[in-house]
Structure formats: C-alpha cells, structure tokens
A protein has these predicted regions:
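Mid-domain alpha/beta scaffold segments of enzyme catalytic cores
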Residues: 1-167
Length: 167
C-alpha cells in the first residue's frame, strides 16, 4: 500500500473534480491520504474531506509559514484548542520556515510560530509535517532543541544539502 503523505486536495482548486482525483489516487494504489492544514480557513474543508473518506483521509493541524498575518497567535491558540479537544489529528503540519518570497512573514515571527507548533508536536506526541524553503540552517537550529522529545516527522519541502538535515 502507498500513502500520499502530503496533499491539499481539500482546497477550492479541487472543488470541481475532487471526487475524481481522490478516486484515481485510490485506484492507483494509494491506501491513505494525509492532509496537512494550511490556515484557519482550510480546517473545515479538510475535515469535510476526512468525513467523506473515513479511514482513508487523515487530518493534520498546523499553520503554513506563508499563511499568516502579523499576529498569528489568535489563530495558533484556536488550532491548539482543536488539538486539545479532538484526537483525530495524526500530525502537526504543515509547519516550517519559508524565506523564499519577499512578502513572506517576518523571519523571526516565522521562527516563533514554528517553535509554538513544535511544542504541540511534543505535547501531543504527533509527528511534524515540515516545510522548509530558503531557511535550512534556521530550521535546523529551531528544531534541534526539541529533537530529543519529538516523535519524528516528514520533510515535505527541503532544498538543503544532506549536511543541513537535522540529526
């Protein structure tokens, strides 16, 4: 069985043909689809997709590093509350650092957001779904203090070298 460890098929771009795309994935041998969240607005569509395909689609909770404003902390608080009250989440994601775009949120703020979400991974013993673009060293430096307590994770996007990987 194959598992698609990272798909955003719940976004509106797939509203017209989501059922066909998901059916093709399952017919091609995907046994499960893991759904990392993007922002506050994508939580409900992500959970709806999990309800439509129970036992095949599994949600994660996280705030993508390019998807927040100058004050992401109310959103983070609401997401943490969802993690506390609902055991259906299988990971914390999509989280990370993305310094590629000039209009990306401030680097220090991205690091604070990543630290907060990494604390969730430790608290709930859930793996991270990590996004890293043009921020390899900073990402490793941010995650290393948590490494002994983290249950693991997947680098969905990582453009660094083997020497830049954590651990």
């Amino acid at each position: 069985m194959f598992i698609d460890t990272h798909t955003h098929l719940y976004t509106e771009e797939f509203d017209a043909d989501r059922h066909e795309v998901v059916s093709r994935a399952f017919e091609a041998g995907a046994g499960a689809l893991l759904l990392p969240n993007i922002n506050a607005e994508t939580i409900d569509p992500m959970l709806d997709m999990c309800r439509q395909w129970p036992g095949r689609c599994f949600p994660m909770m996280g705030l993508h590093p390019t998807e927040f404003t100058s004050d992401p902390f109310p959103t983070l608080q609401a997401m943490h509350q969802l993690l506390q009250t609902n055991a259906r989440y299988i990971g914390v994601g999509e989280v990370g650092l993305d310094f590629y775009y000039d209009e990306a949120p401030d680097a220090d703020l991205q690091i604070q957001v990543l630290q907060e979400q990494t604390r969730w991974a430790v608290e709930f013993q859930l793996p991270l779904m990590i996004h890293s673009r043009s921020a390899h060293r900073q990402l490793v430096d941010t995650l290393l203090p948590f490494a002994p307590q983290l249950p693991g994770g997947v680098f969905h996007c990582f453009g660094g070298t083997a020497g830049e990987t954590p651990g």
